[in-house]
């Protein structure tokens, strides 16, 4: 009985150290990238020794790969896009086939896109994807395409409810993304713009106004 308890305690301790290492590594890699992050710095932040890190991970490459590919997981989407009913429960605007709903969809998109973590993640992916190709693939699949898929589902839902037979939701989503990003994303990415709630709302309002006009002008 004591032996079993001892093994359980040891396993819990190992798991706790693993979590501490992963969390510290995530912070350092998002801030400094692969080359800029040091194992000494990660160990210090995790409260462990460098030797302990190497008992959990074979090398820096393995640690980076595991941590950053995990960071490329959108927990809202899991593996697949949820059905419309689930999206409607998660986002009140998904039920609205209105310009206001479109604006709220844009605001949600921008809140995610312009969050500090997502901007940092994109910088790391563009910097290190050549060394870690799977990182780029996972980012494209789980982050970029995932959020676009929500917009496609929403715009398809609007077209269905409005009986807009000629609308192509995929093309409309690409256009709306471009309007939302215009004059904002690049500036935020390079630290020239702080994406506060007011700036996000202003951008979403402007983009949705233009997009709604386009949708209703040639609605089919």
List where the protein language model places each region:
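N-terminal intrinsically disordered/low-complexity leader segments
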Residues: 1-16, 85, 89, 218-220
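Hydrophobic/aromatic residues within well-ordered alpha-helical segments
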Residues: 17, 60, 71, 98, ...
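Helix-turn-helix
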Residues: 20, 24, 28-67
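An amphipathic alpha-helix signature
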Residues: 22, 65, 99, 103, ...
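A short secondary-structure junction motif
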Residues: 74-78, 82, 116, 132, ...
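Amphipathic alpha-helical packing segments from all-alpha helical-bundle domains
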Residues: 100, 112-126, 133-160
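Hydrophobic/aromatic-rich alpha-helical bundle segments in the mid-to-C-terminal region
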Residues: 137, 145, 156-209
């Amino acid at each position: 009985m004591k032996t079993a308890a001892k093994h359980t305690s040891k396993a819990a301790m190992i798991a706790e150290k693993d979590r501490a290492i992963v969390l510290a590594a995530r912070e350092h890699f998002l801030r400094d990238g692969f080359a800029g992050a040091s194992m000494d710095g990660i160990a210090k932040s995790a409260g462990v020794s460098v030797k302990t890190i190497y008992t959990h991970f074979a090398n820096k490459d393995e640690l980076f790969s595991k941590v950053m590919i995990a960071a490329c997981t959108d927990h809202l989407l899991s593996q697949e896009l949820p059905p419309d009913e689930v999206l409607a429960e998660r986002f009140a605007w998904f039920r609205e086939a209105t310009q206001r709903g479109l604006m709220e969809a844009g605001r949600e998109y921008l809140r995610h896109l312009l969050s500090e973590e997502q901007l940092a993640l994109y910088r790391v992916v563009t910097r290190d994807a050549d060394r870690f190709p799977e990182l780029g693939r996972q980012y494209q699949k789980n982050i970029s395409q995932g959020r676009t898929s929500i917009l496609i589902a929403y715009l398809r839902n609007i077209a269905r409810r409005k009986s807009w037979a000629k609308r192509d939701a995929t093309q409309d989503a690409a256009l709306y993304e471009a309007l939302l990003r215009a004059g904002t994303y690049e500036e935020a990415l390079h630290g020239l713009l702080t994406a506060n709630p007011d700036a996000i709302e202003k951008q979403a309002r402007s983009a949705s106004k233009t997009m709604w006009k386009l949708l209703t002008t040639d609605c089919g």
